[in-house]
Amino acid sequence: MSSTNGNAPATPSSDQNPLPTRFEVELEFIQSLANIQYVTYLLTQQQIWKSPNFKNYLKYLEYWCNPPYSQCIVYPNCLFILKLLNGFMESAIVNEDGLLEGLDELPKIIQLQGPQWMNEMVERWAN
């Protein structure tokens, strides 16, 4: 493609499309936990949730439960799910393969109880 004035076509600069900040990435991930279907997917399709690193990351993300960070949350039920996941993971132990054990029931619990938790959240918002 040639330019009529002889100049090369403009390319997007990093100023026009900046990468998301760590704050934005973490906020997006935290809020995705409010989506029970996504959490179920994480716990059934991906083995990342059995990683001690993922356990540590979820624990680290609890700072979002406190102001001023919690004031940025649009879907507050995500904080409930974060605390729930961390509660389950506290009792997990690392096996000889370096994976977390003792979490086999977690996907089933999230899948079965998740819709009820979402309905309870909606009821709290309605009141």
Curated annotation (Swiss-Prot):
The gene is SOH1. PANTHER family: MEDIATOR OF RNA POLYMERASE II TRANSCRIPTION SUBUNIT 31. InterPro entries: Med31_sf (IPR038089), Mediator_Med31 (IPR008831). Component of the Mediator complex, which is composed of at least 21 subunits that form three structurally distinct submodules. The Mediator head module contains MED6, MED8, MED11, SRB4/MED17, SRB5/MED18, ROX3/MED19, SRB2/MED20 and SRB6/MED22, the middle module contains MED1, MED4, NUT1/MED5, MED7, CSE2/MED9, NUT2/MED10, SRB7/MED21 and SOH1/MED31, and the tail module contains MED2, PGD1/MED3, RGR1/MED14, GAL11/MED15 and SIN4/MED16. The head and the middle modules interact directly with RNA polymerase II, whereas the elongated tail module interacts with gene-specific regulatory proteins. It is found in: Nucleus. Belongs to the Mediator complex subunit 31 family. GO terms for cellular component: core mediator complex; mediator complex; nucleus. Present with 468 molecules/cell in log phase SD medium. This is Mediator of RNA polymerase II transcription subunit 31. It comes from Saccharomyces cerevisiae (strain ATCC 204508 / S288c). The keyword Nucleus applies. Keywords: Activator, Nucleus, Transcription, Transcription regulation. It holds the Pfam family Med31. One of its GO terms (biological process) is meiotic gene conversion. It comes from the Eukaryota. Its main location: nucleus. Component of the Mediator complex, a coactivator involved in the regulated transcription of nearly all RNA polymerase II-dependent genes. Mediator functions as a bridge to convey information from gene-specific regulatory proteins to the basal RNA polymerase II transcription machinery. The Mediator complex, having a compact conformation in its free form, is recruited to promoters by direct interactions with regulatory proteins and serves for the assembly of a functional preinitiation complex with RNA polymerase II and the general transcription factors. GO terms for molecular function: transcription coactivator activity.
